[in-house]
Amino acid sequence: MESLNEYMDKIINRLKAVNEKDELVDEGMRKLQKCQEKIMKTRIDAQKHIDERHEQQSFEQQLLNKNMFETEQLEEKLKRLDDENKIGNEREFNKKLEAISAKWTDDVNLLKTTPNEPNDGNRKKLSNLSNILV
């Protein structure tokens, strides 16, 4: 049988080995805890970045929608103004045409009522043109 001292030395050596391994386990656990903290911090930062990006995209989408709506309104307004301009141009053209026609009719009537003048060729031309207008 072994002596008590040898037996006690073996026990002490084993306790030291267990103690060293316990310290290694504790050190490993501390490292794991630091890794876990880094992972949590990274996740939180990533979530903040995602939230900020989502908020920015939402703002940009609202701005885009607003600009598209304003563009559509301006296009409709431009179309209305273009239509009004065409109508105005047609009215102005019709007024000018009516004024020319009225003056022409007055000139033709004046020539018909005045006695024959020496320039009968012009009178025939006016007569032909008045027949075209009437």
Curated annotation (Swiss-Prot):
GO biological process: attachment of spindle microtubules to kinetochore; cell division
GO cellular component: kinetochore; microtubule; Ndc80 complex; nucleus
Gene from which this protein is expressed: kbp-3
Keywords for this protein: Cell cycle, Cell division, Centromere, Chromosome, Kinetochore, Mitosis, Nucleus
Cellular location(s): Nucleus; Chromosome, Centromere, Kinetochore; Chromosome
Name the UniProt record assigns to this protein: Kinetochore-binding protein 3
Superkingdom classification of source: Eukaryota
Coiled-coil regions, chain positions: none
